């Protein structure tokens, strides 16, 4: 069975983005993301794809979901739905959902794992992570609170579906 992991960094108010960008810069979180996703298929929405500084993400199968039938994401596979994206990952052990807000909302009922970076900020934004329903998720691991090289405090949390 395909393991479906959602990976996200969320502020205290569950904000994940503002103006199609992350409202913070945590190099250590980017490093964790890279190590965790290398060699795995990553699934993202069109806006997340367009926000990437480097496209496609190297060392990963990039799958972009877009409702625009003629959308072309050079270096990635473009599909019309999350279901089609997951079907493309059938031969993999794990697929990683990396955003944005709409894709996270669609993926939550299907996910087996959540890899959440809790960012100790409350920021203004226009994209938010769905509420984590504790009746469906249990905390499996939590790192000690750390402060990034940019001065932002964060914690890595791993949730497993119940």
UniProtKB/Swiss-Prot annotation:
Pfam hit, one: DHFR_1
GO function term, MF aspect, one: NADP binding
Binding site for NADP(+): 8-9, 16-21, 45-48, 65-68, 98-103
Alphabetical keyword list: Antibiotic resistance, NADP, One-carbon metabolism, Oxidoreductase, Trimethoprim resistance
Keyword NADP listed: yes
One CC-aspect GO term: cytosol
Top-level lineage group: Bacteria
Cystine bridges: none
Protein's UniProt keywords contain Transport: no
Assigned EC number: 1.5.1.3
Protein task: Key enzyme in folate metabolism. Catalyzes an essential reaction for de novo glycine and purine synthesis, and for DNA precursor synthesis.
Family according to the record: Belongs to the dihydrofolate reductase family.
Additional information: Strain T47/F62 is trimethoprim resistant by overproduction of DHFR.
Protein name according to UniProt: Dihydrofolate reductase
């Amino acid at each position: 069975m395909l393991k479906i992991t959602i990976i996200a960094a969320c502020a205290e108010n569950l904000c994940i983005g503002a103006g199609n960008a992350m409202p913070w810069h945590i190099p250590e979180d980017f490093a964790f993301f890279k190590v965790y996703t290398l060699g795995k298929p990553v699934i993202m929405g069109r806006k997340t794809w367009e926000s990437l500084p480097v496209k496609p993400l190297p060392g990963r199968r990039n799958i972009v979901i877009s409702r625009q039938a003629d959308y072309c994401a050079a270096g990635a596979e473009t599909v019309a739905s999350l279901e089609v994206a997951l079907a493309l990952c059938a031969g993999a052990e794990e697929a990683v959902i990396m955003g944005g807000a709409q894709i996270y909302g669609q993926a939550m009922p299907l996910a087996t794992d959540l890899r959440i970076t809790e960012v100790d900020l409350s920021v203004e934004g226009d994209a938010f992570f769905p509420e984590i329903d504790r009746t469906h998720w249990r905390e499996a691991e939590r790192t000690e609170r750390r402060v990034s090289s940019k001065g932002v405090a964060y914690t890595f949390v791993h949730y497993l579906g119940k």
